[in-house]
Amino acid sequence: MTDKISEQQRTSPDAYSRHYIVAEIIRQVFSNKKINLLDVGGAGTYVDYFRGSSSPVETVTVIDILPPPDKIEGITYIQGDATKMTFVDNQFDAVVSTDVFEHISDKTKDKFITECLRVAKDLVVVGAPFESEEVTRAETLANDYYKKNTGKPHLWLNEHFELNKPKAENVEAILAKGKYEYLKFSSNQIDSWLQSILLNFMKETNVLERPLVEQFNQFYNSHLDQMGDFKTPGYRSFYVVFKNKALMRGLDQLIPSAGGALAKLDLEAMFLTRLADDRKQLTDQKNSLEETANQNQALTEQIRAVAGQLKEKTEILKELDAEISGLRSRRWYGLYTLLGGGRK
């Protein structure tokens, strides 16, 4: 399991944090019982966040409009529409969904929320980027960078613009109408989100080396509660809805403190130092190559000089050969030969 956690932490903070947060909420709320959980739109790829010896989750069902991924084990996977789920009311102890809501069309966004509420017995957790000036600006900058370096927009970010991000007031109107008790908080402080997502885009487009970015990711994710990640404005908002009010917890019990960012300073120093080291290494390599190139240039000049000398000597030899040929053609040379000239 340690290897699995390490692998998860090497993913981008955007991906890791949202699933880690939901898993922690589930652990805190259901600490004393085993539950069945529905992951709406999870595609089954992040199910390991909800499993393990410390997790209260006993069974996991995934519903997603996409076909199941390869090599998925230990879950029930249903390919279906989350706005028209066939489950009975209150079928699952907990229903969770992260970064799916913004990929639902405006006309069915309300239905998505009401369906999640309908099939949950005790708890609903929905996390997504919601409409705000800061979030839209950050997504635009990230998408522009990706498009500049790949020639096409980022698939998921582009859908946020095409389908529109959800609006908090619409969700809260549904919750108020149903008289649901809920908590709301933000994660992925917007500056940090943009920095980390751009770094991971640089990895995807080979601007930065994969090991360097994964080292950044692992440090960030393993110190999530020390990154100031829960300060506002945040990129992602979470709604934690308690259908079973007896399970209500305070926000301070469910998520790390919003304060403190000491580890972020360490991360920035580590990352910049690593970049400086890499830059120095590249500079040293460049200087070495230039030195080799200069040596090669000098050697080339020497070769050219020798070649020139050889050419001159070849011309001299040709001239001598011509003179010898001329001598041999003269009569007296022939007579001299007949008389036995040169005999010993």
Region annotations inferred by a language model:
Residues R27-T136:
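Conserved SAM-binding loop
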Residues S12-Y20, D99, H103, K107, ...:
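Conserved phosphate-coordination/catalytic loops
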Residues R18-V22, K34-N36, I65, M85-V88, ...:
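Secondary-structure boundary/capping motif
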Residues T2-I5, I75, L265:
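C-terminal or late-domain output modules
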Residues M1-S31:
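Class I SAM-dependent methyltransferase Rossmann-like catalytic core
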Residues D106-A276:
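S-adenosyl-L-methionine-dependent methyltransferase catalytic module, highlighting the catalytic core
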Residues P13, R18, P68-P69, M85, ...:
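A short acidic, often aromatic-flanked loop/helix-cap motif at beta-alpha or helix-coil junctions
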Residues K245-K344:
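Boundary detector for helix-to-coil junctions that initiate low-complexity/charged tails
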